[in-house]
Structure formats: structure tokens, C-alpha cells
A protein has these predicted regions:
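Membrane-embedded alpha-helical modules
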Residues: 110-227, 346-498
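Helix-loop-helix hairpins and the membrane-proximal interhelical loops
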Residues: 1-57, 135-139, 193-304, 389, ...
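Short helix-coil transition sites and intra-membrane helix breaks within transmembrane domains
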Residues: 32-42, 79-90, 122-126, 270-283, ...
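Membrane-interface alpha-helices at helix entry/exit sites of multi-pass transporters
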Residues: 57-61, 98-115, 294-307, 335-338, ...
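Transmembrane alpha-helix interface/packing and boundary motifs in multi-pass membrane proteins
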Residues: 27-41, 70-82, 157-162, 264-276, ...
């Protein structure tokens, strides 16, 4: 399919009223999920678990509609409550929360919304320009190159897993081991399947694994804490100044356009490198702004609006840019992208060269859906912030059972099997212990999703190429060098981000807790 033809097809799909409603509905769910800390990824998992039964075009629009606004509404708890809405909004607290205490919450939120919109739009446009070029490049690759890229992708994600490299590698190995259970695709024989458990012949269900590893542990955390996220302020106090100064904040974004540009560029560059993403970019951009902006060393941490603009410009750009390696190479950069990769596989798409050659119209549908969702989300936040902000005060007694019921229904309907529910409980307990003891969960999901893909490329490679040919192919050598450079640079960025977070947390007294009440810092890619 030609590029112009794909653009027209993508626009034609988006022009359908059902698709527009899907984007709008996804945006509303995304805004609500982002406004409540720890529920962004579970919310996406719930929606995606239900969307796989829809028409693929509608399902993609719904998922992308939800993906974009999450990175905007997670600013609400960061600014109003001093609690990070997600891993990518931690640095926003440092100046956003002091602004709220000074009666400038609306100004901080207005700046954050526009900065996030700019970042999301720029990254979406970048996808539109990069994917046609990527199609030409990946078509010169063969099985050895994709095998190497897949292995390197898993390794990079594991290496930068919150400083726990060994745990990350072990988690990725567990994920690939789980993916190996079932029927051998080459021989057609059972593999690691007890005779008494024929359920496992089809392998472990992706939806079950994702819900059990990510979604249920977060809901269990809310239930065990047995309180709303915000306990030190009332809803009335939190939203009192939420509508004041929004337009002033947006004007400040335009005044600091060079800061926005630098932050967006940094966000995009971080986004296209697997494994770091949202867990790093907010601290890097905040530290960069603090070091380069005039007077920032003295004013950051006291309510300087530039300290809100910098990380918010970058996080949405990073989230969208992470779709580039996910769609072009089939290598997810973090937890969110691993879920999206699994989602595309369940819809019958195969991210990678085949996807770019056969489904370029879907690529442009993704681009247009992201653009529309960013606009929808920003407009709704500008006028409905006070309603979304109240979500953070919902009691777990009300919220958790509802989400839990939806998750269980989604798990059961995936195959209409009670075995799925039983296995879900086992995986959820395992996921809860990973969360509790600080084991990174994204590498496990990425290993699980990439396991069958790597196995397929490995089989083809061993049949068609000798070990020496695999290593000495020019394309392979280039990929190995680039992958090693990315791994080194990713680890370096992760260390710098950790150092920046520690330095800023100890040198800037914001009066807020450094840690989220959830495990937001653990999850990357959001």
C-alpha cells in the first residue's frame, strides 16, 4: 500500500462516527484512569481486554484514544495532592505542588495541559514521518537481524529496570519461559505441559498474564491500603483554585517555547530507546531545565512554572515515541508498549516489517487517533478538571470492587474458561509478590510477548544461516553496535535520572512525600 493511499485510508477510517466515538470514549476513560494514581495501566488493560472483541479499526481507535490523555490527566494528583499520578509525573510535583499551595493550581495545570498537548502532537506527527522511512529500512533486514534486535530489546529493558539488572534479566527469563509452555510450533508436540493439564496445550493466555502481573496487584494494593489516595486535604481544598489562571499558564508555555522544544526533543529521543521511557524522562528534562534556564537553580522547587512545563512537555512525547520501535520493529520499550504489542497481536496484526508493509493504513489511523485524542483530552481537562480531580478521593471500597469485577469478566470472556480464572489467581499472587519485593514487572511481560517471536526468528535463522554468517552479516554487525550503544546510553540515562531524582528530592523542600503510595516508579513506558 502506498503512503498517500494509506493516509487516505486512515483518514477514511477515522471519519466514521463509530471510530470518532471510540476515540472520545477512550479519551474519557484515559483521563479518569490517569487522574487516579496507580490505575493508568490497569485501566488500559481493562479497556484493551474488552476491545479485542471489537472490529479492529474501532479497537485501535479506542486504545489510542485512551493512550494519549493518560499522560495529561496524571498531572492532576501531582499538582493538587503532591502524589505522582504515574511514573512520568513525579518531577512535576516539585514545582507543581508548591504552585497549588500558593493558589496557582490552575496556572500550573493550564501550562501542563498545553505542554503535554504539544509533546503528544509533535510525537504523533513524527510517527507519520518516521514509519514510511522505517518501512524502507526494515525491509533490508532478515531473520538474524530481527533475532538480534529482539534479544537486545529484552536485555536493554532488563538492564535499566530500576537499577535491578539481575532481577530484570531473571524476570525477562521467566516471561520467556512462560511463553514456551504449550505446543511446540515447529514439531506440534506438547512442551512443558503435564498430561493432567490439557488447558496448557494452547499456552498461557496473554490477557491473563497481563492482568495478573500488572492490574490485579495494583487493585490489591488499593484494597490493602484501604483508603483513598488523598487523605491530607479535602476535595474542596484541592480544587479550590483549579479553574483560576489556566490561560495564564498556557501563555507561559508559549513564552518558554525553546524550553518546550528542547524538552520535546529529549522526550522523543528517550522514547525511541527501549527500556527507559517514562521512568527517566521527567527527571532528565527537569534537571536539564534547572541547569540551563536563567535563574532556575534558585527558583526551581519554589513554584517555578518552568519546572512544570519541562517534564510535561516531554512525558507525552515519550509515550507516543515509544510506539515507533513497538510498531516498526516489534520491540516494546516498556510495560505500556508490551501491552499494546500484545493487543495488536490479539487483533491479528504482526508489528514489524509485515505490519509496515501490509497495514500502513493502521499506522496512520494510530497517528490520527493520537492527534484527535490529545485534542479531546486537553479540551476536556481545561473545562472539566474539577470533576476529574475528585476521582482521587474515591474510596477503594467503591472503586476496587468495580475494577476487580471488570477485570475478572475480561479474563473469563477471553476463552470462556474457568481454568483462566484459576490461573489468573496464581499469576496475581506472583505479580503481587514481585510488586511487594521490588522485582521489575515490565521485563517479564516483554519477555512473555517477545518469546514466541524470538523463537520463530531463531528457528528461521538456524535453518538458513550458519552462526558465522549471522554475526558477519553487515546488517547484523550494524545492529549489534547500535544495540550495544543504546544499552550503554540507556543505562547511563537511567543512572543520571536516578541521581537527579535523589539530588532534587534532597535539595528541594516541597513538603511532599518523595514516594508514591503505589509502585508507580517501577513501571516504565507510561
Amino acid at each position: 500500500m502506498g503512503i498517500l493511499e494509506a493516509v487516505v485510508a486512515g483518514l477514511s477510517d477515522l471519519a466514521s462516527p463509530v471510530v470518532i466515538l471510540a476515540v472520545l470514549g477512550g479519551s474519557i476513560v484515559g483521563l479518569a484512569s490517569g487522574a487516579l494514581p496507580a490505575t493508568g495501566l490497569p485501566g488500559i488493560i481493562v479497556l484493551i481486554s474488552l476491545a479485542v472483541y471489537m472490529d479492529p479499526v474501532v479497537a485501535v481507535a479506542l486504545a489510542m484514544g485512551m493512550a494519549a490523555p493518560v499522560q495529561s490527566s496524571d498531572t492532576l494528583p501531582s499538582v493538587l495532592l503532591g502524589v505522582p499520578g504515574s511514573v512520568s509525573s513525579q518531577a512535576t510535583i516539585i514545582d507543581g505542588y508548591p504552585m497549588a499551595r500558593q493558589g496557582r493550581a490552575g496556572e500550573a495545570l493550564g501550562a501542563a495541559y498545553l505542554a503535554s498537548l504539544i509533546g503528544g502532537v509533535v510525537a504523533a506527527v513524527l510517527i507519520a514521518f518516521v514509519m514510511p522511512v522505517a518501512r524502507s529500512i526494515v525491509n533490508i533486514f532478515a531473520s538474524p537481524e530481527f533475532l538480534i534486535m529482539g534479544i537486545m530489546g529484552v536485555v536493554v529493558v532488563a538492564v535499566v529496570s530500576g537499577g535491578a539488572m539481575l532481577k530484570g534479566l531473571l524476570a525477562a527469563t521467566v516471561g520467556m519461559a512462560l511463553a514456551a509452555v504449550g505446543t511446540d510450533p515447529g514439531l506440534g508436540l506438547p512442551r512443558f505441559v503435564p498430561d493432567s493439564v490439557p488447558y496448557l496445550l494452547e499456552g498461557f493466555n496473554l490477557i491473563i498474564v497481563v492482568i495478573g502481573i500488572f492490574a490485579l496487584p495494583e487493585i490489591m494494593g488499593l484494597i490493602i491500603e484501604n483508603r483513598s489516595i488523598a487523605t491530607d486535604v479535602t476535595p474542596e481544598e484541592a480544587i479550590r483554585d483549579i479553574n483560576e489562571g489556566r490561560w495564564l499558564g498556557m501563555r507561559e508555555v508559549m513564552k518558554n517555547k525553546f524550553l518546550v522544544f528542547r524538552s520535546v526533543v529529549l522526550g522523543v529521543l528517550v522514547g525511541i530507546m527501549p527500556g527507559i521511557g517514562g521512568s527517566v524522562v521527567d527527571w532528565l528534562t527537569y534537571a536539564q531545565a534547572r541547569a540551563t534556564e536563567k535563574g532556575a537553580a534558585e527558583s526551581f522547587g519554589t513554584g517555578d512554572i518552568r519546572g512544570v512545563i519541562a517534564p510535561e512537555s516531554a512525558n507525552n512525547a515519550t509515550s507516543a515515541a515509544q510506539l515507533i520501535p513497538t510498531l516498526a520493529l516489534g520491540i516494546p520499550g516498556g510495560a505500556y508498549q508490551a501491552v499494546y504489542l500484545g493487543f495488536f497481536l490479539l487483533l491479528g496484526f504482526q508489528p514489524g516489517p509485515r505490519f509496515l508493509n501490509d497495514n500502513m493504513d493502521v499506522v496512520f489511523l494510530i497517528v490520527f487517533s493520537l492527534l484527535l485524542a490529545n485534542v479531546f483530552g486537553t479540551v476536556m481537562l481545561l473545562f472539566l478538571s474539577k470533576y476529574f480531580a475528585r476521582i482521587a478521593f474515591i474510596s477503594p471500597h467503591v472503586l476496587s470492587p468495580v475494577i476487580l469485577a471488570i477485570l475478572l469478566v475480561a479474563a473469563f470472556t477471553s476463552k470462556n474458561s474457568y481454568w483462566d480464572l484459576g490461573f489468573l489467581m496464581i499469576v496475581a499472587v506472583f505479580g503481587w509478590h514481585m510488586k511487594r519485593y521490588g522485582w521489575p514487572r515490565p521485563p517479564l511481560i516483554i519477555g512473555f510477548v517477545l518469546g514466541p517471536i524470538l523463537e520463530r526468528f531463531l528457528s528461521r535463522t538456524l535453518v538458513l544461516y550458519s552462526p558465522l554468517e549471522i554475526v558477519l552479516r553487515p546488517q547484523s554487525m550494524i545492529i549489534i553496535v547500535v544495540a550495544l550503544a543504546i544499552a550503554f546510553y540507556s543505562a547511563k540515562l537511567a543512572r543520571e535520572s536516578k541521581q537527579a531524582a535523589h539530588t532534587l528530592a534532597t535539595s528541594v523542600d516541597t513538603g511532599v512525600a518523595e514516594d508514591s503510595p503505589t509502585s508507580a516508579r517501577e513501571e516504565s513506558g507510561g
